[in-house]
Amino acid sequence: MKWGLATAGLPIVAHSLTASGEGISTAAKNSEPGGSIVALPSGAQVFYREDWLGAPWLDGEPVLFLHGNLETSEVWYGWVPRMAQRFRLYRPDLPGFGRSKVPANFEWSLANYTKTAADFLDAVGVASAHIIGAKTGGAIAMQFAATYPQRTRTLVVASGPFSSVDPKTENTSQQVRLGSAATKEEMAYFDKLRDATSPETRRGIGGIISTINLDNLLPKITARTLIITSDRSALQSVETVLRYQPKIPNSRLLVLTSDAYHVAVANADECVTNVLGFIQDAKMPG
């Protein structure tokens, strides 16, 4: 069961340089088990996974996934089987997470992560993409869409914060993050991802999320936007989301029936169904 809200807050029924958006990359790519690594101008080394399950003679429209705090690009596993049949997926480990490295002088700011996302698209030869972000990655995605409107085909934000978040939320139990349906094995896996996050990254990201303020940027987002949250999110209430979402032109809100706040994982299949429909609708004129 789910319900959605249009821009004005009224209930609704939930539902490049080349043709594919590819540019020409001049960045050196190094193959890694399970993916590749590209070097960005900032000095960051970004590991990423590229997924395409469509016909080999076709080239799907690009989608850029931006994960949240205390995790890696692996968390999009529930999105890949269906999304990659229609889109070419780029799933980077954000700098400081997983197999991606930050340079010694890395600037821990939302603006720098936004620039990093743009530099990554340059490195893989993508001029524009559908941008999908979860949790802190959702905040990066919103700032990206406001900063690079010409590079944003559509925007999807799954449980992304619009304003500051207490860094202590990193100590929240996986049961709260993933919901009551999460298994012990699933929670143990996410504990492992959390524990693998370096103290430097935790401090840096903690400083970012404690100062998030997207209020003035939201009206600058011109891409069609889908905001996804849950009706019992411990991260932010539906009422909180409703104070911000209508400020994004051409946006809609989808509220899922769930007690998890990491809906991109806990409600992955439902998210994918709605995102596929949303992107299809966004391509329609009007």
What are these regions (language model features)?
Residues 189-216, 232:
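Hydrophobic, aromatic-rich cap/lid helix
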Residues 44-99:
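Conserved HGGG/HGGXW glycine-rich cap/lid loop of the alpha/beta-hydrolase fold
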Residues 127-166:
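Conserved hydrolase catalytic core segment
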Residues 221, 227-229:
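Short beta-strand/loop motif that positions the catalytic acidic residue
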Residues 1-19:
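N-terminal export signals
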